[in-house]
């Protein structure tokens, strides 16, 4: 259960650029477009056992919403939305159904975590997927250069251990990048400029929220 106030918005990754900071240094930033999020549900300790606020974004046609979803949005008094997210926060009672949350939820200099789905790479070998060194290029290596090597002895252990790093589908997984800084906020255009790279492709959905492990600056 959350014991702190958490701010968050759903947005779309537009791409990367760079800008000058206050110390005249070039800083790479990712631009996130934040369409107004609306509050569609408020969870309380009395009813749900915890406090949280549910946000939704990207309006869709009424005919595209399932009956349960349409009823849910109708109860909140808003048009159906494509994406929803729930944030556990101690100040959920301060929100109201239908309230809009914009990029102004964050101020310049705020520390945030960004959650997104990484780019899918398809089926990848162990060198690309896990960074294996591979087998030698010479000294008798015969068509084994990119193979993983032994994954378990014949008699001992006589099996492959769970979690063995092997080839397989790479990417397209939920990932959180922590402790990024909001370099600038353009409230008029609904843009957040966040230091560094964030997960996902251009046009991908991301969740920007208050950092859970923000570094405390020593005096």
Swiss-Prot record:
Keywords: Ribonucleoprotein, Ribosomal protein, RNA-binding, rRNA-binding. It comes from the Bacteria. The keyword Nucleotide-binding does not apply. GO terms for biological process: translation. Pfam families: Ribosomal_L3 (PF00297). Residues 136-156 are annotated as: Disordered. GO terms for molecular function: rRNA binding; structural constituent of ribosome. InterPro entries: Ribosomal_uL3, Ribosomal_uL3_bac/org-type, Ribosomal_uL3_CS, Transl_B-barrel_sf. Part of the 50S ribosomal subunit. Forms a cluster with proteins L14 and L19. HAMAP family: Ribosomal_uL3_B. This is Large ribosomal subunit protein uL3.
């Amino acid at each position: 259960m959350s014991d702190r106030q958490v701010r968050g918005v759903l947005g779309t990754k537009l791409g990367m650029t760079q800008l000058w900071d206050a110390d005249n240094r070039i800083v790479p930033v990712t631009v996130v477009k934040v369409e107004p999020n609306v509050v569609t549900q408020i969870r309380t300790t009395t009813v749900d056992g915890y406090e949280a606020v549910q946000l939704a974004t990207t309006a869709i046609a009424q005919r595209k919403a399932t009956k349960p979803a349409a009823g849910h949005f109708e109860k909140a008094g808003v048009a159906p939305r494509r994406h929803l997210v729930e944030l556990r926060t101690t100040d959920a009672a301060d929100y109201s159904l239908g309230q809009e949350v914009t990029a102004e939820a964050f101020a310049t200099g705020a520390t945030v975590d960004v959650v997104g789905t990484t780019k899918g790479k398809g089926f990848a070998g162990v060198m690309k997927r896990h960074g294996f060194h591979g087998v030698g290029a010479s000294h008798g290596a015969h068509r084994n250069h990119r193979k993983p090597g032994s994954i378990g002895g014949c008699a001992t252990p006589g099996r492959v251990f769970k979690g063995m790093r092997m080839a397989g589908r790479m990417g397209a997984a939920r990932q959180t990048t922590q402790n990024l800084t909001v370099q600038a906020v353009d409230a008029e255009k609904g843009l957040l400029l966040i230091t560094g790279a964030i997960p996902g492709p251009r046009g991908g959905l991301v969740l920007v929220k208050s950092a859970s492990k923000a570094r405390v600056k020593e005096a």
